[in-house]
Amino acid sequence: MSDPVASAPRTKRVVRIVILVALALLALPYLLTILYGGGQPVSTLMLWRWATGAPVSRTWIDIENISPALPRSVVAAEDAKFCSHHGIDWDSVRDVIDDMQDGEASRGGSTITQQVAKNLFLWPGRSMIRKALEAPLALWIDFVLPKQRILEIYLNIAEWGPDGQFGAMAGADYAFGRSAAQLSAKEAATLAAILPNPRVRSAKAPGPGVRRLAATYVARARAAELRQCWRENRES
């Protein structure tokens, strides 16, 4: 029969180890964010697909080489206040809370920075635990990385096709048979219109809903001047 007095220290050691491992896992994304100021990071979904043998297609492209219409369209579609918030759009958060209190379907309030946090370090799907982890990560990412770099990462890790097409290059090649550097304003807006559901919406064979969204984003993208955003971000 085991001695409860002797087993108590072992139990405490196990608990300490578990706590230390949990703290290390929580700290890892914050350390990796600093390293992701450079390089070509991949998403957790890409890693999972590689691990399970599912197809993954991704070719990194620097944001300077992407057709300017695509980052403008994505900002117009996904996060109109991208240049002015600090990782979280609190107005959108309040709208989501109001929707929940009124019993209405949530419109979603994730910024591009929050989506980068989720894609790089967390998991897809709706979860309060994930949201609780995502919020401080988004604030940290916005603090550590320039806006231009955040958007560059997003454009290279977003899922843009039904068969493992990740990033703007793979998405543009799948939908239009061309490089992300060669996208027209309409093509860029069409790619933006299928986010964040490329398995449900298609840029290759867009339905009426996608075409309507794309037409809206073409107009909005003309007003999304990002050069000033990059300058202001560097000066702040």
UniProtKB/Swiss-Prot annotation:
The keyword Repeat does not apply. Pfam families: Transgly (PF00912). GO terms for cellular component: peptidoglycan-based cell wall; plasma membrane. InterPro entries: Glyco_trans_51 (IPR001264), Lysozyme-like_dom_sf (IPR023346), PBP_transglycosylase (IPR036950), Pep_trsgly (IPR011812). Its EC number is 2.4.99.28. It is an enzyme of class 2 (transferase). NCBIfam families: mono_pep_trsgly (TIGR02070). This is Biosynthetic peptidoglycan transglycosylase.
